[in-house]
Amino acid sequence: MLPPMALPSVSWMLLSCLMLLSQVQGEEPQRELPSARIRCPKGSKAYGSHCYALFLSPKSWTDADLACQKRPSGNLVSVLSGAEGSFVSSLVKSIGNSYSYVWIGLHDPTQGTEPNGEGWEWSSSDVMNYFAWERNPSTISSPGHCASLSRSTAFLRWKDYNCNVRLPYVCKFTD
């Protein structure tokens, strides 16, 4: 039998081992974010702790990101998981539009100078741990340096695109 003082430390050690084991086995942490407990402005939808809105008035990538930054903690959407990607896809598809591409917050400020496409980053500065490229831009002879969601992939996959083209866009923000 363990002395009373050892019980909390053993419990903590067991919990730490279980958490480490789930990471080592490659088990994805929670697939779906908890249901939203935030209120979002009209025309936007909640997912996790953020609001998301699709804007159909086309803008260049830079102008779209600047428009998103006018909202609290806003940027063009960063897609950080497959579950979030599915949510954004359903948001874009729920509002009928004739566009083939929609801006997201991924861009390559190095304009392809980093090897193997490593210059890509989210405008929100979120860490890139999830990738959903339609085709890896480092394998394309003349890639664009901004990313869009592509209708041909049901708005689930990313495609590099010319940053100056005017497209609809998705903002992610808090409210």
UniProtKB/Swiss-Prot annotation:
Propeptide cleavage-removed residue intervals:
27-37
Tell me how the protein is altered or processed after translation.
Proteolytic processing by trypsin removes an inhibitory N-terminal propeptide and is essential for peptidoglycan binding and antibacterial activity.
Where located? Secreted
Residues engaged in binding Zn(2+): 50, 107, 121, 145
Expression sites by tissue: Expressed by keratinocytes. Highly expressed in epidermal keratinocytes of psoriasis patients (at protein level). Constitutively expressed in intestine. Low expression is found in healthy pancreas. Overexpressed during the acute phase of pancreatitis and in some patients with chronic pancreatitis.
**GO:BP terms for this protein?**
acute-phase response; antimicrobial humoral immune response mediated by antimicrobial peptide; heterophilic cell-cell adhesion via plasma membrane cell adhesion molecules; negative regulation of inflammatory response to wounding; negative regulation of keratinocyte differentiation; positive regulation of cell population proliferation; positive regulation of detection of glucose; positive regulation of keratinocyte proliferation
Name under which the protein is recorded = Regenerating islet-derived protein 3-alpha
